[in-house]
Amino acid sequence: MSKKTIFAILLILSVLIIIRPKEETLLRCAMFGPMKLFSSDTCMAYFNVFGYSENVYQDLRENFDVASLLSLSPERKYYFAQLYLDNGNDINKKIDQGMPIHSAILKDDLEEFYWLLEKNADPSVVDHLTDLDAYDFIDIMIIKQPTPNRLEMHKVLERYKPSS
């Protein structure tokens, strides 16, 4: 790393320490974008250097869920969703905006779908918005709006489906 880069990082961290924004503010900056003085990357640098306090984990637990974190920008969504799960939060917890696996199916996001299954999302959990599990939901989505991604999701879910 060049001396200029090291100096810039130290300067940014010094300003962060001097003005001391709350960690919750820095978390939102890192997740959603810039705040008055700092870019999202600068806020991420703070956490990369100092780590996450219990306040940050509590903020994540109380104000976010996997589905909302997976709606962040592509470069941040898996990072924060994993941080949420690493703190012991349940990927299969029923939430107001629906189950994350249903959201991935609806968004036609194959990468997110695979990520959720890898993290033990349970396709048999019934989503309270649709009153369907992921198996039935994918069947309906294929009828209403078939896509190559949804056809792939259907194949994958057929392998997960418990035999009757």
Set out the residue ranges of the language-model regions.
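Low-complexity, intrinsically disordered short peptide segments enriched in small/polar/basic residues
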Residues: I6-I12, D122, Y135, D139, ...
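Ankyrin repeat domain, specifically the short helix-to-loop turn at the C-terminus of the second helix
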Residues: V49-E54, F80-I91, Y114-P123, M153-S163
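Hydrophobic membrane-insertion alpha-helices, especially the h-region
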Residues: K3-K22
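Long amphipathic alpha-helical segments
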Residues: N87, H102-I105
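Extracytoplasmic/periplasmic C-terminal soluble domains
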Residues: L132-S164
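Ankyrin-repeat boundary/"N-cap" motif
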Residues: E24-L72, K93-S103, V126-I142
